[in-house]
């Protein structure tokens, strides 16, 4: 009872604090920097991270097994991963806009996890025999961290596409801090060049104003961080798939069975392998790689929620239909 109450308190504190953090980010989009706002959002996300960490540890001790057994626990762990990738740019003293793009992921996953749809999963249950393996921690943690990193990196690529095609919500045009995003800009000419070539390109590129230059710098920053985060997520995903294959051979006698989860995991891996390859090819880099990563954003959600929504295949543990 004590553990259940503590878990309930930590869940609602983390959700409330991250809601405040999102509000702070939205306010800073429309007004000039207010003293203390950025520090408040950073401290707020640290509190959220600590609350989610405490929630996972509490559930671990209360259930007697790692909190990776169902959709609810995996969503909590996913939001924990999002909060980590949110804080990395902040501690690197990067612009606040990167964290603003990533921050909604935390509240969406945390909100869905605590919603009434997953009420039956909130109570800890005995781990099913198929999941009672030492591979559980390696496989599931690597897969979810991979999902979190790839989703964050893909979000930055989506932001690049939105800025490039100038499809932002018109009301944001009133923001002094974001107005530079709406100036004319020949993005195709830049194509994410490296530092050695940047000066040459800048000399032949016509910027109508300093705001145009800031827009270019912002796109470069999004691309640089997106590539780093996706590269890290790809490593996590690869380790997760390989460890899952070994576990599958021990549990089912086959390394690969092509059930829905495995198939979509392979599709996800392929999409981001194409993305990383396109980054090495100057003919495909730039806008093309951002499009590939944006497609990967949708593919990950299909891979993550697909089996849980359908409740089919060998990976249907903790799905909606199984409850």
Curated annotation (Swiss-Prot):
Pfam families: Cytochrom_C_asm (PF01578). GO terms for cellular component: chloroplast thylakoid membrane; plasma membrane. The keyword Transmembrane applies. One of its GO terms (biological process) is cytochrome complex assembly. It is found in: Plastid, Chloroplast thylakoid membrane. It is a multi-pass membrane protein. It comes from the Eukaryota. The chain crosses the membrane at residues 17-37, 44-64, 68-88, 98-118, 143-163, 229-249, 262-279, 291-311. One of its GO terms (molecular function) is heme binding. Keywords: Chloroplast, Cytochrome c-type biogenesis, Membrane, Plastid, Thylakoid, Transmembrane, Transmembrane helix. May interact with Ccs1. NCBIfam families: cytochr_II_ccsB (TIGR03144). Belongs to the CcmF/CycK/Ccl1/NrfE/CcsA family. Required during biogenesis of c-type cytochromes (cytochrome c6 and cytochrome f) at the step of heme attachment. This is Cytochrome c biogenesis protein CcsA. It comes from Lotus japonicus.
């Amino acid at each position: 009872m004590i553990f259940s109450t503590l878990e309930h308190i930590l869940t609602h504190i983390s959700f409330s604090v991250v809601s405040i953090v999102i509000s702070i980010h939205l306010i800073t989009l429309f007004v000039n920097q207010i003293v203390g706002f950025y520090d408040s959002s950073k401290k707020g996300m640290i509190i959220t991270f600590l609350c989610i960490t405490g929630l996972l540890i509490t559930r671990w001790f209360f259930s007697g097994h790692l909190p990776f057994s169902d959709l609810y626990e995996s969503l909590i762990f996913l939001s924990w991963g999002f909060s980590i990738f949110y804080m990395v740019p902040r501690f690197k003293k990067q612009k606040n806009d990167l964290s603003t793009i990533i921050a909604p992921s935390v509240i969406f996953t945390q909100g869905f996890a605590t919603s009434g749809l997953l009420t039956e999963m909130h109570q800890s249950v005995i781990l099913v025999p198929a999941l009672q393996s030492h591979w559980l921690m390696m496989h599931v943690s690597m897969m979810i961290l991979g999902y979190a990193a790839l989703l964050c990196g893909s979000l930055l690529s989506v932001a690049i596409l939105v800025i490039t095609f100038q499809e932002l919500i018109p009301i944001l045009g009133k923001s002094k801090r974001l107005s530079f995003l709406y100036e004319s800009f020949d993005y195709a000419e830049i194509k994410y060049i490296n530092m050695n070539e940047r000066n040459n390109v800048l000399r032949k590129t016509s910027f109508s104003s300093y705001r145009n230059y800031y827009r270019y710098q912002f796109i470069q920053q999004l691309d640089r961080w997106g590539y780093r985060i996706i590269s890290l997520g790809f490593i996590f995903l690869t380790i997760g798939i390989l460890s899952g294959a070994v576990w599958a051979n021990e549990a089912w006698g086959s390394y690969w069975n092509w059930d829905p989860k495995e198939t979509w995991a392979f599709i996800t891996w392929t999409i981001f392998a194409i993305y990383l390859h396109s980054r090495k090819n100057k003919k495909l880099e730039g806008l093309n790689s951002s499009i590939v990563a944006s497609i990967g954003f949708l593919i990950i959600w299909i891979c993550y929620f697909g089996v849980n929504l359908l409740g089919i295949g060998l990976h249907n543990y903790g799905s909606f239909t199984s409850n």
